[in-house]
Amino acid sequence: MKISVANFKAIEQLDDYDLKPLTIISGANSGGKSSLIQLLLVIKQTLENNLGSQKLILNKPYVSLGKYKDIIFEGKSKNNLYWGLIFFNEDIPIAVKNSLFFKKINKGAIKKLEIQVKYKNNNSNLYIQEFFVEWQFETKGFTLFLHLNRERGSKYSVVTNSALFFKDEYIQYLKERVVSNSSLLIHDGWKANISFNKFFPFESTPTSSDEESEYTDEYFSSLANSFLEKVMSNYFSKISYLGPLRDEPRSFYTNDDDSTLKIGNKGEYAAHILEQKATNSVVFNKIKYYESGTIEYYDDKDTLENAVNYWICAVFKMAIRIKVNPIQSGMMYRIEILNDLGQKVPINHVGFGVSQILPIVVEGLISPSRSTLILEQPEIHLHPNVQSLLLDFIYSLVLSGKKIIVETHSDHFITRLRRRIAEGSSDVKKVNLTFVENKEYKVLKLTDSGSLEYWPQDFFDQLDKDIRAIVKAQSKKKNIAMLSNFKGDK
């Protein structure tokens, strides 16, 4: 999927940003790294909210951003929020692609679906200023598009090249009004009062003539628009998010029979999910290590509990064994860690490391193929070596068909990525490495040898600077000592 954004938080303009299987966003503090992630979460919580009249849900459950003026670039009311999404064939559910509706078109497979939404705020009344959707098919030159533009008052001009956006009873009337142009229907210049359900047009009161009113009431209640909603809802429902401050470990957890419980923004339900699904089978990747230090991934199938233990214990080496044990007749349960001394201790007795990485591993393993996992600063409370190994785990999820978006400050994480690309165990074509500098998103070009063609200023070069400073200081002290000894000999 590609995303375009204008006038959202720190982003003034970002065009066709490619969310690759592994997207890594880094940069200085307060530089705008989180803005793109926040927009994705705003769209997600808007789609999942039952209040269809709300055009944009800015607060809860995934992110809270305040009022509309708070999310506008530089807080200027003249700046109108815009976002656009491009879904490619692999992003579109099979049920939509194989539907009778699109087979009826008989123009080939869906190549991509594009949606653009532009907002305007007038006297604290947020409304959709412009809406555009286009279905593009593999057959050369064949598209279906609908463009709505609000001009004055609540009236929208309607431009489309297909009657398929409308109800069946309206199609015949539409055919009588439009003109033929290169075998495509053109309907231009008609105006209507249009209502939106979230981002989707769903009804209209015609404003041109009484003749039209017979046909156009709720004319957007069509399959074409319902499929648009299905594509978006399917994609965003498969997004899970783990914020930078994950839940603190507890001595025990209350049992909950809710099998639909999600991971939580802080990973607060990771223990519950592990307890509920411990014996569930998962397909995941393991690592084969070579003496040279290179690795090779291979598929495996095991229980969730064993898969979690493989990564946290065998790879990260943060414990000998992790196990969920029920207590008080199953009313509560405890996550116990078998440590290097052979002692079984509650998870809250072993520091923050295990509890911080547990939600990442659990959610990563149970997420389905074609899902998206967003991680903000996953390296917090982790040893540098584990930060490096975390990249190996995250890339294993990519190989399982999952999409990962990571915002990170970890040079260990990115250095490990470059190493794995150079060694050939990670594919550079699956990676988008972005550095945010002065609120500008700069995609860094990685070569297949793990090198960067452009190295931004202050991009993880502090370690090199400090090492050079240490060597310089050591050399200076050594020279002073030699000079002192030389004078003493005299």
PLM-predicted stretches and their roles:
Residues 1-90, 95-97, 297-487:
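Switch/communication elements of ASCE P-loop NTPase nucleotide-binding domains
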Residues 1-250, 324, 421-426, 432-438, ...:
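P-loop NTPase switch/coupling surface
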Residues 20, 96-99, 253-267, 448-451:
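Short, polar loop/linker segments at the starts of domains and inter-domain junctions
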Residues 23, 46, 139, 143, ...:
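Residue-identity detector for threonine
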Residues 103-109, 151-192, 252, 268-275, ...:
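Contiguous hydrophobic segments
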Residues 189, 213-349, 482-490:
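Extended helical coiled-coil dimerization/tether regions that scaffold
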